[in-house]
Amino acid sequence: MSHVTLLGLPDDLGNQLSRVLLEESHQASRKLYVSDLRRGPNTCAVFISGDSPDYRQTLSLLREARPGLPVIVVSRQPDAKRWLDALDAGAADYCGAPFEREQLRWIMGSLSSSAKLAAAAPAGAIALAAAARSHG
């Protein structure tokens, strides 16, 4: 079971998202502020509201506070323009209500795959450098 944080989401969105995440075996906690991420369990991803006018600022604060932590932007209505804007602002992904199990399974799975690739990259680079030195 992984742990995710729902940061500043309105109650209706937070409740819907928590329910579906739990169905997919993810534990969700609710936080109000970026600084609250320092307290409580370690989180593997943060969901924030794209409906908030300052969500880009929240993304920026999260990147400063927790570099590399995936942030998923959520909204009440799926919208292609918002999706592209969220990705452009640095979000790992975007989803809109109503939340579906398959949708969240895919998002959480892609985050897990990305984390595995990132963790393997330094080891692979070290191995390639060592191989190059031994043949050089």
Q: Where are the language model's segments positioned?
A:
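Conserved phosphotransfer microenvironments
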Residues: 14, 33-68, 75-82
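CheY-like receiver
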Residues: 115-136
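Two-component/phosphorelay signaling modules centered on CheY-like receiver
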Residues: 7-32
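Residue preferences within the helical output face of two-component receiver
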Residues: 85-86
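C-terminal output helix
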Residues: 99-108
